[in-house]
């Protein structure tokens, strides 16, 4: 039996204040002046209560790359950022292209206890793009996989992509595409534009993303299957998704926090913390993806949390790995880029960071409203706080954050998962997890 928790005075979705009583893993009651014998009472006055955040795009690295991250360390980072569920990308070793690997990941997440870990299955065997992986076996496994991706690699062959879309349609699955034409991005180091030209580095053109998105929209429309576009980053990509939705195509899209805030100007210092795939784009692209998220063209925010050991980033730009950690900072960045700018309110944040990703990923028990009878999956956020993002804010095994030393608003204070507090007043709780 879980501990009873009584949070007093939380502002649900940033609006009316209410008490939240948690008992036996569920929200037992919402109201004012609540009391419950034996419940631990927490002063949540003024804190914004949001449904537990759900990340549809996380790299947890286990099995195979535990020097960068483990499922335990990654879900601790998730809890610190207000997340109660993460979808684990399949670029592990072995690749998550079979029922055995996705079930292993699921079990490791259950053992850790800090957040639900929902595996994403690879589209192709070994993520090599040559033949379909065991999509049906992963879907019918205990992991109940519904999202499939070769993220890190594009499913470039149109015949393979068409067959994947056709296959997952049978069980309402979704193909999450890493939209990158590999021929157009050979040797690319950063966004193709003025900055890449000045630095003399090979550019990653916007059309390399947009051409794959355009092709896959047409394939998804032809097949009548669901397509999800990972880490959309250009103004042209936003227009393509907008066009597809007007046509009634079953397409959804995500944007990362870093593409909502940062630009390729940061590459001028050759600091590899800012090297990522797709690359940071221009200020015009940043404004376009913000607008797309605000008007519903882009469905969700997803972190693309990508931890790397220090030696993979503390090197020359050309040799550095792509990727940034983002679980602990995501909500604060969205607060700065979207809420403080007036583009989203807290109810919108709940949609793009909780209910919509859970819906796209067919994840039951998450993304539910903060209401009596619902699963106790929520986070409490101090929107009035502010501070410099520091290494002490990171709780995974890697520190390749682009926000270190940057002023960010807000602070996640409490995360409740499955009725337990995984984060208590800003401190990770001891879940008795595996070591």
Residue ranges of predicted features:
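Histidine-rich, glycine-flanked metal-binding segment
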Residues: 1-52
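A glycine-rich helix N-cap at a beta->alpha junction
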Residues: 107-123
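Histidine/acidic residue-rich metal-binding segments in metalloenzymes
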Residues: 132-301
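Divalent metal-binding segments
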Residues: 59-68, 87-99, 119-132, 149-160, ...
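C-terminal cap of metal-dependent C-N hydrolases
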Residues: 316, 372-435
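Metal-associated gating/positioning segment near the N- to mid-region
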Residues: 45-112
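Divalent metal-coordination and catalytic microenvironments
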Residues: 10, 25, 46, 57, ...
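His/Asp/Glu-enriched, well-ordered alpha-helical/loop segment
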Residues: 198-226, 273, 294-295, 299-301, ...
């Amino acid at each position: 039996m879980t501990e009873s928790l009584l949070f007093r005075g939380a502002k649900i979705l940033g609006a009316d204040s209410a008490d939240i009583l948690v008992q036996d893993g569920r929200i037992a009651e919402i109201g004012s002046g609540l009391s419950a014998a034996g419940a631990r009472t927490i002063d949540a006055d003024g804190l914004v209560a949001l449904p537990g955040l759900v990340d549809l795009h996380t790299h947890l690295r286990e099995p195979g790359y535990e020097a960068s991250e483990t499922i335990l360390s990654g879900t601790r980072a998730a809890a610190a950022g207000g997340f109660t569920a993460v979808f684990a990308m399949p670029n592990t070793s072995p690749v998550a292209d079979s029922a055995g690997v996705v079930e292993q990941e699921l079990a490791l997440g259950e053992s850790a206890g800090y957040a639900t870990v929902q595996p994403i299955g690879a589209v192709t065997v070994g993520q090599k793009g040559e033949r379909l992986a065991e999509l049906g076996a992963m879907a019918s496994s205990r992991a109940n996989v519904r999202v499939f991706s070769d993220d890190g690699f594009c499913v470039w062959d149109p015949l393979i992509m068409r067959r994947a879309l056709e296959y997952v349609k049978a069980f309402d699955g979704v193909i999450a595409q890493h939209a990158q034409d590999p021929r157009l991005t050979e040797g690319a180091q950063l966004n193709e534009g003025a900055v890449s030209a000045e630095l003399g580095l090979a550019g990653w053109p916007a059309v390399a993303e947009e051409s794959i998105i355009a092709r896959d929209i047409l394939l998804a429309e032809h097949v009548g299957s669901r397509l999800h576009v990972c880490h959309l980053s250009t103004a042209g990509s936003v227009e393509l998704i907008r066009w597809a939705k007007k046509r009634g195509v079953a397409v959804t899209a995500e944007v990362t926090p870093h593409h909502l805030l940062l630009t390729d100007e940061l590459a001028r210092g050759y600091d590899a913390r800012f090297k990522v795939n797709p690359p940071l784009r221009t200020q015009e692209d940043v404004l376009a993806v913000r607008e797309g998220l605000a008007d519903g063209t882009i469905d969700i925010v997803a972190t693309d949390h990508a931890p790397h050991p220090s030696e993979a980033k503390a090197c020359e730009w050309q040799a550095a790995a792509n990727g940034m950690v983002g679980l602990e900072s995501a909500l604060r960045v969205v607060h700065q880029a979207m809420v403080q700018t007036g583009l989203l309110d807290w109810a919108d944040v709940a949609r793009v960071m909780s209910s919509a990703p859970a819906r796209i990923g067919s994840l039951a028990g998450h993304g539910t409203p903060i209401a009596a009878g619902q699963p106790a999956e929520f986070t409490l956020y101090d929107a009035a706080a502010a501070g410099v993002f520091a290494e002490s804010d990171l709780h995974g095994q890697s520190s390749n954050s682009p926000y270190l030393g940057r002023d960010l608003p807000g602070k996640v204070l409490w995360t409740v998962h499955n009725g337990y507090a995984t984060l208590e007043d800003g401190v990770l709780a001891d879940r008795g997890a595996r070591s």
